[in-house]
């Protein structure tokens, strides 16, 4: 059975959750953290994913890639690229398909990977984390992404999940996932005809800011409006602090960290920590050793200084709030609660700005870091055939209108707006077209000028074939089922011809008709499905050979990572065995080994140690196993004698304890019999 898995794919850190019969649980990673760094690093032998990537980030800065969610599905010529590129220390390149990729060194060779591959590497890592923690199969995943993700980006993240060996049952907007978490676990929501509770969710994470207005009733929610600033987040605060200290250190220490990627990254990491400290304290020290040119730096910052530093950023808080309210056709007075999520909302001055924008106090009833992942896990569980969850209905909304067009074959309209902006999804529409033969259809955004800069207006194209027009007929009616699926992806589910047939239908009897009245029939015309047509889709999704090639490459890299990890484990096991056996041979094992055995084994241990730190320092798994088994062949023999003697001692001790217990019991019984006898004698007297 597959365990439903929810992933909050964060720009800086990601959170994993699983749904089980007893509820929704956060999954801790290999170092017991409840979030995992969203990093992919590359080394001399293998990849460093998640925590391993973070550990090596500073020393491996050119070969470590973060900000994964920002480049998935992004064209190299997209206007956002210039903004995003400043946050990357690895080399970004243009791929053959015009997408953004990265060039790194892996196993001593220059390698180029697409953003989809990088995301797949990380998703594969967290999949493995969940499998290790839950000891269960992981097949299905629900991934939470920003509401501003385009159709192309949603397909790309779904492709990444497939490359990682997962079935993406749903790509959900992250704030919607948090709202599901709110709605499912809140017990005081209005019911029936009562006025719904209107809640504004403000999510400010590492790289973006989303405001969504939701209407809640028990067991359901509806998204009323969503707006965002996709270039406003915690990393902007971190960079503002870093730039402040870069200027200070240039003047104070005569070093320019902007010229050294490693130095800049170290100060950036320290700036993030300083930001968090100042969220709880009014002042904090700031220092780093050997930043560059063997120079140690130190300084400090107060909360007031930080607030002054980020004032230009705070002016951007209001706009998404205003736009979300306008889309929902509401005012701040209509909002019942304002829930804040995302780590950046912990900054006191930012919280004040959000509160002022709504003119309301803020609520933190949700876990700011984990609500999205838990909501995603619950949504994944809804799609599970084996796990029962409480009923909960939710609908998201189309941010932009989507139209479908088709070949003009007869005198009729050539296009139609099918999913207007603000309408809910998932949703299905059925249209009827008069067709004279095979045809094509396209989906596109109705008003491209309203899209974010760089977003492609065209969404998908379909070829619909197999249409047979009867002889003598000019055209035939074709029913086309258009759908916006739960992930917000636009598809054509079905296309088929119809025909009218005449059938006999029972005429309803009058109410006063006798019970034995004979039924009457009438002939009616019904429209029924005739022939299903073939649909070939041309979307942003990877299919066939391109997808299989990426899966094959990922599997090969995963196998290499696994081999390197297992080899390191075997090497460590050999090293530990050498030191442990040498110590025990001098102490507890000493009485159980002959002098000849001691001499031989001591020599073997010395040779193995010398080999391990020389020729065997970078050897293969099989050789470490062979060396271990060579030592164990004699070491285990001596250990067996020691264990046999220890068992003999335990048995002897157990026998003595049992004999002592029997003696004590016999003494107690004798004393009891004596007391009873004395009592009888006393009774006779």
Curated annotation (Swiss-Prot):
Keyword terms of this UniProt record: ATP-binding, Chaperone, Cytoplasm, Nucleotide-binding, Stress response
Biased composition (Basic and acidic residues): 673-685
CDD domains, sorted: ASKHA_NBD_HSP70_ScSse
A GO CC annotation given for this chain: cytosol
SUPFAM superfamilies found in the cross-reference section: Actin-like ATPase domain, Heat shock protein 70kD (HSP70), C-terminal subdomain, Heat shock protein 70kD (HSP70), peptide-binding domain
Origin: domain of life: Eukaryota
Gene Ontology MF, one: ATP binding
Region (Disordered): 651-685
Cellular location(s): Cytoplasm
InterPro entries per record: ATPase_NBD, Heat_shock_70_CS, HSP70_C_sf, HSP70_peptide-bd_sf, Hsp_70_fam
Gene3D superfamilies (UniProt xref): 1.20.1270.10, 3.30.30.30, 3.30.420.40, Actin, Chain A, domain 4, Substrate Binding Domain Of DNAk, Chain A, domain 1
UniProt key word Transmembrane: no
Similarity comment: family membership: Belongs to the heat shock protein 70 family.
Protein name: Heat shock protein homolog SSE1
Species whose genome carries this gene: Naumovozyma castellii (Yeast)
């Amino acid at each position: 059975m597959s365990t439903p898995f929810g992933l909050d794919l964060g720009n800086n850190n990601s959170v994993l959750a699983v749904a089980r019969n007893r509820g929704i649980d956060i999954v801790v990673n290999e170092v017991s953290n409840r979030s995992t760094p969203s990093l992919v690093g590359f080394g001399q032998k293998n990849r460093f994913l998640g925590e391993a990537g973070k550990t090596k980030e500073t020393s491996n800065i050119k070969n470590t890639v973060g900000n994964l969610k920002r480049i998935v599905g992004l064209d190299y010529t997209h206007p956002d690229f210039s903004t995003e590129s400043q946050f990357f220390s690895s080399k970004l390149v243009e791929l053959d398909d015009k997408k953004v990729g990265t060039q790194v060194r892996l196993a001593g060779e220059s390698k180029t990977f697409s953003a989809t591959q990088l995301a797949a590497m990380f998703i594969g890592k967290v999949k493995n984390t969940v499998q290790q923690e839950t000891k269960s199969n992981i097949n299905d995943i629900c991934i939470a992404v920003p509401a501003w993700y385009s159709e192309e980006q949603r397909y790309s993240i779904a492709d990444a999940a497939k490359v990682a060996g997962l079935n993406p049952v749903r790509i959900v907007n992250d704030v919607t996932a948090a709202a599901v978490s709110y709605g499912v676990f809140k017990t005081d929501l209005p019911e029936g005809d009562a006025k719904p509770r209107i809640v504004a969710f403000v999510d400010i994470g590492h790289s973006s800011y989303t405001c969504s207005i939701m209407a809640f009733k028990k067991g359901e929610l509806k998204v009323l409006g969503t707006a965002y600033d996709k270039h406003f987040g915690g990393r902007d605060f971190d960079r503002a602090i870093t730039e402040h200290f870069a200027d200070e250190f240039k003047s104070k220490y005569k070093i320019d960290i902007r010229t050294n990627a490693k130095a800049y990254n170290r100060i950036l990491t320290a700036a993030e920590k300083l930001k968090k400290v100042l969220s709880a304290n009014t002042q904090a020290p700031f220092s780093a050793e050997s930043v560059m040119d063997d120079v140690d730096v130190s300084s400090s910052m107060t909360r007031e200084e930080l607030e002054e530093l980020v004032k230009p950023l705070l002016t951007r808080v209001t706009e998404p709030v205003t736009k979300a309210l306008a889309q929902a056709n509401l005012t701040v007075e209509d909002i019942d609660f304002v829930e804040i999520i995302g780590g950046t909302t912990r900054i006191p001055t930012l919280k004040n700005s959000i509160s002022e924008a709504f003119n309301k106090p803020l609520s933190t009833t949700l876990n700011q870091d984990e609500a999205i992942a838990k909501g995603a896990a619950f949504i994944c569980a809804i799609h599970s055939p084996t796990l029962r969850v409480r009923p909960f209905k939710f609908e998201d909304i189309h941010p932009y209108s989507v139209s479908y067009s088709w070949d003009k074959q007869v005198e009729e309209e050539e296009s139609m707006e099918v999913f207007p902006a603000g309408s809910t999804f998932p949703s299905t529409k059925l249209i009827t077209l008069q067709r004279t033969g095979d045809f094509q259809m396209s989906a596109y955004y109705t008003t491209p000028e309203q899209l974010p800069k760089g977003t492609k207006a065209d969404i998908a194209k379909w070829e619909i074939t197999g249409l047979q027009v009867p002889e003598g007929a000019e055209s035939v009616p074709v029913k086309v089922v258009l759908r916006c699926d739960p992930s917000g992806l636009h598809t054509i589910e079905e296309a088929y011809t119809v025909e009218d047939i005449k059938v006999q239908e029972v005429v309803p009897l009058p109410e006063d008709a006798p019970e034995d009245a004979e039924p009457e029939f009438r002939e009616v015309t019904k429209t029924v499905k005739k022939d299903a047509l073939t649909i070939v889709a041309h979307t942003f999704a990877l299919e066939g050979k391109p997808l299989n090639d990426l899966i094959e490459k990922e599997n090969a890299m995963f196998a290499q990572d696994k081999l390197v990890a297992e080899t390191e484990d075997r090497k460590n096991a050999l090293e530990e065995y050498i030191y442990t056996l040498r110590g025990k041979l001098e102490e507890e094992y000493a009485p159980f080994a002959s002098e000849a055995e001691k001499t031989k084994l001591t020599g073997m241990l010395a040779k193995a140690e010398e080999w391990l730190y020389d020729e065997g320092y970078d050897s293969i798994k099989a050789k470490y196993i062979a060396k271990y088994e060579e030592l164990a062949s004699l070491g285990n023999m001596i250990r067996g004698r020691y264990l046999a003697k220890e068992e003999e001692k335990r048995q002897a001790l157990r026998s003595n304890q049992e004999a002592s217990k029997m003696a004590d019991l016999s003494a107690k019984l004798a004393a009891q019999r004596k007391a009873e006898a004395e009592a009888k004698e006393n009774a006779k007297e």
